[in-house]
């Protein structure tokens, strides 16, 4: 949008905040780092203002996605590309150097590098963010190797350095980090953070840098190789939450945690079962899905077919896809007949010549073409879009046939879903007055059902008559064998206290207190 930069510059006047971060090491051997929560309002809801070029960056990253990763193997450009940190709500404070220089950072379980702005960076953003000054630190050590990280809203580039990093009362010696000489984008100037501290695995660290958390464990600074997140979703309370390094705080959760093993070392990734809408299975994850617990992602991201079904159930307004309706009108009856004749669902779209493969690609790999305004500019893009819509139609029809719906009802339902197709990485609006009638959305993890109520997955922006309600669900498509993939961000982690067990390579979830 033409006025985007001017909007960003204008918004920065409203978004300067001070952080009173509390951190402590108690006599139970746990390190607690308090988090500050930023309340969503129309001025700081930046996710909806991300320029279309950022969506193109995401699409490019998805095309490069490494589908062959196994435990211990991953790609630097994977889930990190999803991130739009500008609408993140939770931040904490660290310090770098001797004497300590303070920085506000996002603690991000979905990436693994530590970066802050370099003193050598000169831009408008520098006036609103702390910068690391190596010349003022007696513990600084030069490295100089160049580094670059691609995010959803741009790239951070700079060079590696070494210095002591203070997290709470603990000091990590000679920690490698990136001094950023290029910030993510112009919109970074209105962000509430100065940098990012990754809590993922070294396998996805740019430059194979040793993460801060690894050094905490290696240097014997924590009681156990475990850390946990408690995010306070109570909008009336200022306290944002707490990260506990070295264990868990029983006051942060109720009952027992359900643990699942890490299946893809790199991210905190695990296997997940089906997704339910008001108790009814969607069927999409019957064959299994993967999920990543990601504190650096504000929303809850998942495959477009399921997100569209959720949007329909909650009345969210997305992007109307005429291409979707065209496929339903021309091929809907044929697809249904093939399903009723027990044809292989994975091969139906190739049988009717909408896909050029026989089920090996997987649903939604080319979904960016479905809603891309430029999809019609080339026959290849158009064909990919038709193929993706066909794949989604098969999934939706399978779900409806399981419920013994009539043919007419199924076709009408699929057309309604076409009207609810979300924008790539975009958010969808809902009627704030309809929250009480919206369904529960549930996730199956470790054989247990984890429910999200409407007030937990709908984000309210603003107050009174000007209040807006935004769906906490957004579309994100990764093909097999790595996908289908869900990103369980702050919407999920706010409802469920999350334990990241580095020693036993597992993730645990329990009801947050």
From Swiss-Prot:
It comes from the Eukaryota. It is found in: Vacuole. Residues 319-424 form the Saposin B-type domain. One of its GO terms (cellular component) is vacuole. InterPro entries: Aspartic_peptidase_A1, Aspartic_peptidase_AS, PEPTIDASE_A1, Peptidase_aspartic_dom_sf, SapB_1, SapB_2, Saposin-like, SaposinB_dom. Keywords: Aspartyl protease, Disulfide bond, Glycoprotein, Hydrolase, Protease, Signal, Vacuole, Zymogen. Its EC number is 3.4.23.-. Residues 1-24 form the signal peptide. Its main location: other. One of its GO terms (molecular function) is aspartic-type endopeptidase activity. Residues 25-72 form a propeptide. Glycans are attached at residues 143, 404. Disulfide bonds join 120-126, 285-289, 324-418, 349-390, 355-387, 432-469. One of its GO terms (biological process) is lipid metabolic process. The active site is at residues 108, 294. It holds the Pfam family Asp. Residues 90-510 form the Peptidase A1 domain. Heterodimer of a 32 kDa subunit and a 16 kDa subunit. Involved in the breakdown of propeptides of storage proteins in protein-storage vacuoles. Belongs to the peptidase A1 family. PANTHER family: ASPARTIC PROTEINASE A1, BETA-SITE APP-CLEAVING ENZYME, ISOFORM A-RELATED. This is Aspartic proteinase. It comes from Cucurbita pepo (Vegetable marrow).
